[in-house]
């Protein structure tokens, strides 16, 4: 059975500066946990759960998330998203995030795990008004490496676009077979189980950049970490790690550094 699932959320400020979901609509394969308000970071944490086995051929899933001025929202998932083998067909995911001035949105799902023969295409568009902030992360694992199944998907297409006041900040696109992406991992010397992460940080307000040196200092044997400035505002952070555990620890270390400069990131995405 294939799904045409959707997730529609809107977050807005409420009494005492709390953030609440003023709109929530979802259909399989999406389900929401009970939101958690983090008093320290002043962020509403929402965990999106996929109660099905994973993503199958023919699935079409769509997310629309809006954060109003003065609200702060963290979206996460409890586990990896698995894209299963497809003898034919394709699965698609479209994501659209809108963040108003004075709002904050962090999207940090678990890693994407494409299985042998899968064909998955994901498009993400982020639209921010000046003064909005956010942190947007994508993680990719090479497949079921523990089962000897790595870099075996048929096609993987990941598109990401971020705009500030309508002006393009960054547009990225990966469209490769497993074998083609394996070559990049080998170039980095990260081995057959290499994992990738791509993060976009939009500060939203003036902040010192002492964090940059600390994040770049996480580049070491076993993990490649790079930081580059976007054309007008914000930063791109890229990570290549030798395995999933190393990637997870590196991302945790990056968030710990950033939380010192951006208090909204003090919310633990694994709190639920």
From Swiss-Prot:
Keywords: Chaperone, Cytoplasm, Nickel insertion. Pfam families: UreD. InterPro entries: UreD (IPR002669). GO terms for cellular component: cytoplasm. The keyword Ubl conjugation does not apply. GO terms for molecular function: nickel cation binding. It is found in: Cytoplasm. Belongs to the UreD family. UreD, UreF and UreG form a complex that acts as a GTP-hydrolysis-dependent molecular chaperone, activating the urease apoprotein by helping to assemble the nickel containing metallocenter of UreC. The UreE protein probably delivers the nickel. This is Urease accessory protein UreD. The gene is ureD.
